[in-house]
A protein has these predicted regions:
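N-terminal helical cap/lid subdomain that shapes the substrate entry/recognition surface
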Residues: 2-99, 107-109, 120
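Asp-based, Mg2+/Mn2+-dependent phosphohydrolase catalytic module
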Residues: 1-7, 99, 108-226
Length: 226
């Protein structure tokens, strides 16, 4: 068990609050096959990054706007199996609403659709791909999130599940909790995660005065990916 003090929490969404793994894999695999690309490679690259970045990487000479719109439309339509990760709803409900934000690589429209489908509350403070010029792994999304909650990034804790997001949080100056929900633990550690836990069920709000005091359980359960 570890005790962490911070001023605010900045959550990634997919892989942290919402289990959209299968939907993401279906959409990006289909797109990869259509363009003669390796589906596994594309799916892995797409996690935690703005969809436009992945489109540009794999189709440098393609119609980026059209392909990105195609991806987003399919993602908004494919909600099968989409659920909240264990502990996500309880943790969000326990936190003061002005002390947490969602910082996601999704567009606002897609993020809102997925939050509704998963039964999670819409945050008071929302940073999406539409709000920044440079997405993760650049620090811009988390710098904007920290500014929006009213604290320096160094006083915030980022909760992430993939290397691109962890690097973004660290580059912004925040501490980062990595979740074992999407990639192997060594990838989280190599990206710079300060603590690694199974999922949001392993993060609890112990007290709230001027600062949030969190308790995190870094022990790995046998059934998790690591």
């Amino acid at each position: 068990m570890h005790s962490i003090s911070c001023s605010a929490l900045l959550f990634d969404m997919d892989g942290v609050l919402i289990d959209s793994t299968h939907a993401v894999a279906r959409v990006w695999s289909q797109w990869a096959v259509e363009h003669g690309l390796d589906p596994d490679e594309v799916v892995h690259a797409a996690h935690g990054r703005p969809s436009m970045s992945t489109v540009k990487d794999y189709l440098p000479n393609g119609d980026h706007e059209a392909e990105n719109l195609k991806i987003e439309r399919r993602e908004m339509e494919d909600l099968d199996g989409l659920v909240a990760w264990p502990g996500a709803l309880a943790l969000l409900n326990a936190l003061p609403p002005e002390r947490w934000a969602i910082v996601t690589s999704c567009t606002r429209a897609l993020a809102e659709v997925r939050l509704r489908a998963a039964g999670l509350p819409r945050p008071h403070i929302f940073v999406t791909a539409s709000d920044v010029v440079r997405g993760k792994p650049f620090p811009d999304p988390y710098l904007k999130g920290a500014h929006a909650v009213g604290f320096p990034a160094r006083e915030c804790v980022v909760v992430e599940d993939v290397p691109a997001g962890i690097r973004a949080g660290k580059a912004a100056g925040a501490s980062v909790i990595g979740l074992r929900t999407t990639v192997a633990e060594r990838e989280l550690r190599d990206a710079g995660a300060d603590w690694i836990v199974d999922n949001c069920a392993k993060i609890a709000l112990e007290s709230y005065r001027n600062q949030l005091t969190l308790v995190v359980d870094t022990r790995m359960e046998r059934a998790t990916h690591g």
